């Protein structure tokens, strides 16, 4: 079983005389910065001069510097920019300003695990990854609670990296809930697999396959949308709150019987494909493909996204959502 750390396992004292730089001020960045500051830690924010978040960070009372300057000033640098821009930001602004004994930190292991960022041997490298969006991290902190997080030590140059990482996790409120020890490899590979096989790729493919099956059989697209997409939230919310068994407790016996007698057909069909997807993540094939795709300005990425935007389920959904006053009515673009 995993090693889990709580409040009593961490001390903020090790950060008392240090400065933490938060690189980025988006969903996670603003939550980390505010929570750390409220925990008594000196925090500065690193943003490009043209960043739309610069004004917000300043209004929140932070000193805002360029990433180069912030790296010079800080002892701990948490990099919370998107994965795809991190290597360039690191190479241009962070690496030249690192000195022995500093620490860099991440909330996702992609660039370290796949070698897109290779830190010098004389600095600490760790990860603190909350398992929830930034607004939840902030809200739970303000409520005196916390969001569980992952922690990993990639490189301990000072001998104090784990203590620094745990202090950081405590500063954002994560140790109130529990911090699970992992590795950069495990976090990266499981995160990518979950996104591809279940949460994003798997879920959207299942929705489209179900929708198309009903429409091709002559059923109205509106009915197919309700049964294969709209009602998914009801089930996912139950699973999220109570687990699979708890969800089954809340649905009809007919739905339950169909679940346990027919669901295995999908299971048996997709599990071998999931294993292949995991292999492509483990051997670096997906990472190489994604890195090259970005270097080529994302032609396949953009083409596939645009193709899916034209799917009938999108047209039908847009019309049906206008009938639902409890939704915002504002379409995301």
Swiss-Prot record:
GO terms for biological process: isoleucine biosynthetic process; L-valine biosynthetic process. HAMAP family: IlvC (MF_00435). It catalyses: (2R)-2,3-dihydroxy-3-methylbutanoate + NAD(+) = (2S)-2-acetolactate + NADH + H(+); (2R)-2,3-dihydroxy-3-methylbutanoate + NADP(+) = (2S)-2-acetolactate + NADPH + H(+). Belongs to the ketol-acid reductoisomerase family. Residues 2-182 form the KARI N-terminal Rossmann domain. The keyword NADP applies. Mg(2+) 1 binds at residues 191, 195. Substrate binds at residue 252. Mg(2+) 2 binds at residues 191, 227, 231. Its cofactor is Mg(2+). The gene is ilvC. InterPro entries: 6-PGluconate_DH-like_C_sf, KARI, KARI_C, KARI_N, KARI_prok, NAD(P)-bd_dom_sf. This is Ketol-acid reductoisomerase (NAD(P)(+)). Disulfide bonds: none annotated.
């Amino acid at each position: 079983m995993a090693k889990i750390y709580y409040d009593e396992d961490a001390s903020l004292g090790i950060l008392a005389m240090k400065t933490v730089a938060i690189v980025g001020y988006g969903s996670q960045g603003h939550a980390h910065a505010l929570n750390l500051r409220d925990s008594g830690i000196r925090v500065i924010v690193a943003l490009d001069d043209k960043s739309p978040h610069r004004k917000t960070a300043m209004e929140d009372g932070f000193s805002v510097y360029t990433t180069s300057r912030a790296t010079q000033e800080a002892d701990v640098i948490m990099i919370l920019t998107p994965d795809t821009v991190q290597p360039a930001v690191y190479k241009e602004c962070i690496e030249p300003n690192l000195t022995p004994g500093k620490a860099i930190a991440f909330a996702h292991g992609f660039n370290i695990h796949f070698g897109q960022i290779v830190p010098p041997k004389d600095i600490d490298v760790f990860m603190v990854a909350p398992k929830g969006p930034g607004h939840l991290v902030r809200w739970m902190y303000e409520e005196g609670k916390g969001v569980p997080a992952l922690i990993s030590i990639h490189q301990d140059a000072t001998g104090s990296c784990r203590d620094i990482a745990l202090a950081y996790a405590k500063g954002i409120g994560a140790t109130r809930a529990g911090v699970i020890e992992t590795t950069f490899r495990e976090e990266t590979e499981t995160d990518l697999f979950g996104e591809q096989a279940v949460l994003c790729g798997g879920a959207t493919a299942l929705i489209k396959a179900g929708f198309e099956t009903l429409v091709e059989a002559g059923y109205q697209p509106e009915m197919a949308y309700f049964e294969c997409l709209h009602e998914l939230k009801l089930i996912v919310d139950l699973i999220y709150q109570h687990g699979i068994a708890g969800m089954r407790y809340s649905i009809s016996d007919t739905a339950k019987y169909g679940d346990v007698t027919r669901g295995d057909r999908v299971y048996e069909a997709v599990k071998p494909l999931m294993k292949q997807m995991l292999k492509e993540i483990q051997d670096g094939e997906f990472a190489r493909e994604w890195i090259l795709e970005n270097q080529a300005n994302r032609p396949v990425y953009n083409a596939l996204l645009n193709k899916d935007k034209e799917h009938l389920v999108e047209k039908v959904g847009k019309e049906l959502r206008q009938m639902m006053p409890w939704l915002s009515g504002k379409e995301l673009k």
